[in-house]
């Protein structure tokens, strides 16, 4: 079974975390996880630039260290880089000390105090430890673009069906992501419905 939105219990447990923009307007935020990737990120940046959209990138620390030129390009285009950990750890099976250390190791490659837990998996003691230094950001819609077996048509269908005011959308600028096949179509669909993609700094305080 696939879950396109976080479980409601997560919103109750992580009460100070962000899952959605609080707004009555037709505003959206695009976020991208697990990059940068030389085969995906440059094309993604071109698409965002064409549509004058600024986005939030939660970069894998190892990839950020490996591709500093891509990190610099993301920042130069006016996007924001959040912390996604250095080693993409699963919080459910990682000790508090190891998890916090991994987040700290990724900090030099970020440009904000925003953090998204890899896989969305975060134990409460980890959350409690991190929230003093970071604003934890989850998402409102995840269309499984990272899973090629799901397919780009299904990803686009999910986005169209689940889209609502204030949606924070998580996509992936990785080698296996299908986002290149549907992102432009999704942007055109959203703007055609009167939605605007807003700058991350207009949503988050950090």
Regions found by a protein language model. Give the residues of each.
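A short, conserved beta-to-alpha structural element at the edge of catalytic cores
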Residues: 50-76
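Acidic-and-aromatic substrate-binding clefts and catalytic sites of carbohydrate-active enzymes
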Residues: 35-39, 58-67, 89-97, 116-123, ...
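CE4/NodB-like, metal-dependent polysaccharide N-deacetylase domain
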Residues: 45-54, 58, 79-80, 86-89, ...
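Short, basic/glycine-rich phosphate-binding loops at helix/coil junctions
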Residues: 24, 79-86, 135-140
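Catalytic grooves of carbohydrate-active enzymes
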Residues: 159-201
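Anion (oxyanion) recognition and catalysis
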Residues: 49, 75, 130-131, 191
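His/Asp/Glu-enriched short active-site or ligand-binding loop at hydrolase and phosphoryl-transfer sites
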Residues: 121, 127-160, 195-206
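N-terminal pre-catalytic segment of deacetylase/amide-hydrolase enzymes
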Residues: 1-30, 36-50, 66-69, 186-189, ...
């Amino acid at each position: 079974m696939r879950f396109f939105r976080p479980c409601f219990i997560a919103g109750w447990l992580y009460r100070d975390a962000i899952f959605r923009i609080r707004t009555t307007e037709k505003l959206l935020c695009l976020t991208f996880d697990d990059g940068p990737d030389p085969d995906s990120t440059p094309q993604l940046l071109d698409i965002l630039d064409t549509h004058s959209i600024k986005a939030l990138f939660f970069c894998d620390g190892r990839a950020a260290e490996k591709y500093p030129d891509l990190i610099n390009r993301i920042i130069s285009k006016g996007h924001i880089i959040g912390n996604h950990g250095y080693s993409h750890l699963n919080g459910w099976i990682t000790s508090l000390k190891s998890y916090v250390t991994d987040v700290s190791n990724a900090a030099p490659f970020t440009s904000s105090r925003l953090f998204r837990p890899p896989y969305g998996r975060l134990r409460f003691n980890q959350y409690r430890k991190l929230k003093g230094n970071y604003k934890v950001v989850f998402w409102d819609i995840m269309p499984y673009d990272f899973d090629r077996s799901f397919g780009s048509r299904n990803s686009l269908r999910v986005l169209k069906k689940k889209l609502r005011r204030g949606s924070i959308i998580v996509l992936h600028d990785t080698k296996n992501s299908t986002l290149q096949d549907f992102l432009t179509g999704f942007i055109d669909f959203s703007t055609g419905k009167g939605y605007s993609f807003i700058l991350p700094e207009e949503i988050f305080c950090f």
